[in-house]
Amino acid sequence: VNVKFSDTISLPPAEIFDAIVDHVKMSKYFISGANSSIVEGRKIMWEWADENAEEEIHVHKVEQDKLIEFEWSATGKPTTTVISLEPADTGKTKITIQESEWDNDEQGGKYAMQQMRGWTDFFNSLKAYLLFNVNLRTGERL
């Protein structure tokens, strides 16, 4: 089972890419902390203090302003996540996230739905941060 979905933000790819790879910026909308920014070949620990959770990601590939690929085990099973950015209409960027792969059974379906919810939260929180300077995790204006 795989999940793949897209959304558009009215900003250029470079600005969105920076908000995703920079751990200080990412902690203003998605995670509560990390020990590093996203860099190809690096192992990074992401933390969600409000969920009392942390997860190590293994960054496989980074293409400036275009692509981030990493492996993690957020559902207890290793999966690969690919975040791709491409210019859309003038001044907009299409973001596509694909995560794979879970077993093709009921539990795999549950994991996929759980991650789809998480990535939907990511999209919404990224937009709120970049467009309105709001952290949806805390409800605070930054």
Protein language model features and the residues they cover:
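Hydrophobic-ligand binding "helix-grip"
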Residues: 49-92, 100-103
